[in-house]
């Protein structure tokens, strides 16, 4: 796996986690 792809995946996971937690806290 290319480092750039792995870094992109990590960023996407972090972003998704933040977005999910934010949306969940609003419920």
UniProtKB/Swiss-Prot annotation:
The entry's keywords: Ion transport, Membrane, Mitochondrion, Mitochondrion outer membrane, Porin, Transmembrane, Transmembrane beta strand, Transport
Keyword match Lipid biosynthesis: no
GO molecular function: porin activity
Cellular component GO terms, alphabetical: mitochondrial outer membrane; pore complex
Tissues with expression: Photoreceptors.
Major localization class: mitochondrion
One GO term of the biological process aspect: monoatomic ion transport
Cellular compartment(s): Mitochondrion outer membrane
Disulfide bonds: none
InterPro entries associated with the record: Porin_dom_sf
Family, per entry: Belongs to the eukaryotic mitochondrial porin family.
Primary role: Forms a channel through the cell membrane that allows diffusion of small hydrophilic molecules.
Record remark on domains: Consists mainly of membrane-spanning sided beta-sheets.
Subunit structure: Interacts with hexokinases.
Protein name as annotated: Voltage-dependent anion-selective channel protein
């Amino acid at each position: 796996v290319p480092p750039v792809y792995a870094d992109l995946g990590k960023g996407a996971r972090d972003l998704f986690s933040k977005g999910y937690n934010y949306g969940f806290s609003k419920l």
